[in-house]
């Protein structure tokens, strides 16, 4: 196994971890605080997720000898940001994370549930995701309106670097954010001391509680979004690169690591979609049989980044929240545009997808349940009625 290691896979692994962490950690923090986490709990959740996905990547790639890339659920974090605090607060959200992990395990081991997830029309799943992401993608505009001197550098860095390489667009925006905070924000007394103290990793256990509203508003939509937007595309990327793993055990393993991270604030661990292509492609290594080391190296780097989560969260908290939300919004624009296109491409499902999108994007909940769930229900009913009428005709 050690003979398969290469410097090329080392550099690619570190790059994968940097891109994966830097491009979406802001979304994770925004999502966790959106469902009631305080700063310490959000830092703990970020650390738990990063370490869990790192260990998961190392374990899976070592056992299978396949370049399986692992990530946290960025669309799932975006869903959390739009869900709001449910009855029971963050404890209830953690209970929902546990249920989501259990559902992912069942989907991997029990094929009927996996088939049910696969039976959800892709147009509706994408419309729900696009509806969740819409309000978050407004954040860059709001940041510019809040303070052009702070917001514009972040957006311009993303746009200029993105015109050359989409891969580095969000990391460039993140660097601009760091410079804005360091040079433009008045640091409170003791800020540097606080950053130094935050370098010591601190996991915070959150006792889970369970409520019907949290299960329906968070657990079910999080499970659907994670499976439809991360796990299933992750398998597809591997197949495109001529790797053919059994999906079930991979899904179940990510579900297990979701269960392990949830009590410390982590929402979902899953197969990666974007960085999966980096792991499995020829840039990872010319020899297909040796590319799995890129995933192992990425896993090691994720663990290191996870140990720095407290310092990252403390630094982010020094700036107005709208600025880090702008970075998160920029990170989600690509996901929003691809989801919107996929939702409205098929004429047969377009109207039902529009209903799903609008109900979800409205952010309006009923009976303590978020709009994401009701959007999927409304779109599903619309599609069923349309197909029923067409069948009778």
What is each residue range found by the language model?
Residues 16-18, 56-68, 257-267, 363-367:
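Transmembrane alpha-helix interface/packing and boundary motifs in multi-pass membrane proteins
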Residues 1-43, 171-247:
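Helix-loop-helix hairpins and the membrane-proximal interhelical loops
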Residues 2-6, 30-59, 220-292:
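Membrane-embedded helical hairpins/re-entrant loop segments and their flanking transmembrane helices
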């Amino acid at each position: 196994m050690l003979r398969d290691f290469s410097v090329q896979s080392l550099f690619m692994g570190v790059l994968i971890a940097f891109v994966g962490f830097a491009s979406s950690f802001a979304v994770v923090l925004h999502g966790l605080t959106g469902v009631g986490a305080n700063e310490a709990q959000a830092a703990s959740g970020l650390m738990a997720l990063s370490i869990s996905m790192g260990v998961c990547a190392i374990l899976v790639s070592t056992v299978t000898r396949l370049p399986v890339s692992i990530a946290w659920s960025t669309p799932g974090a975006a869903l959390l940001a739009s869900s709001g605090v449910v009855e029971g607060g963050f404890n209830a959200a953690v209970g929902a994370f546990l249920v989501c992990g259990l559902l992912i395990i069942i989907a991997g081991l029990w094929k009927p549930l996996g088939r049910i997830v696969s039976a959800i029309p892709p147009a509706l799943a994408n419309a729900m995701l696009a509806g969740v992401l819409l309000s978050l993608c407004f954040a860059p505009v709001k940041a510019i309106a809040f303070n052009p001197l702070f917001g514009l550098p972040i957006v311009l860095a993303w746009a200029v670097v993105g015109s050359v390489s989409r891969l580095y667009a969000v990391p460039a925006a993140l660097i601009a954010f760091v410079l804005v905070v360091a040079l433009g924000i008045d640091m409170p007394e003791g800020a540097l001391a606080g950053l130094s103290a935050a370098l010591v990793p601190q996991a915070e256990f959150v006792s889970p509680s369970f409520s019907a509203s949290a299960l329906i508003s968070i657990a079910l939509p999080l499970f659907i979004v994670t499976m439809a937007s991360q796990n299933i595309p992750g398998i597809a990327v591997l197949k495109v690169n001529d790797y053919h793993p059994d999906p079930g055990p991979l899904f179940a393993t990510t579900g297990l690591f979701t269960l392990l991270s949830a009590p410390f604030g982590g929402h979902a661990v899953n197969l990666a979609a974007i960085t999966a292509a980096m792991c499995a492609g020829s840039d990872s290594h010319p020899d297909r049989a040796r590319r799995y080391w890129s995933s192992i190296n990425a896993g090691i780097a994720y663990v290191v980044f996870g140990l720095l989560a407290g310092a990252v969260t403390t630094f982010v908290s020094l700036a107005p929240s709208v600025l880090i939300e702008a970075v998160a919004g920029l990170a989600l624009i690509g996901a929003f545009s691809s989801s919107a296109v996929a939702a409205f491409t098929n004429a047969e499902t377009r109207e039902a997808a529009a209903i799903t999108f609008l109900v979800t994007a409205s952010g309006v909940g009923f009976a303590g349940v978020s709009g994401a769930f009701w959007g999927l229900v409304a779109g599903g009913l619309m599609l069923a009625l349309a197909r029923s009428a067409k069948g009778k005709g």
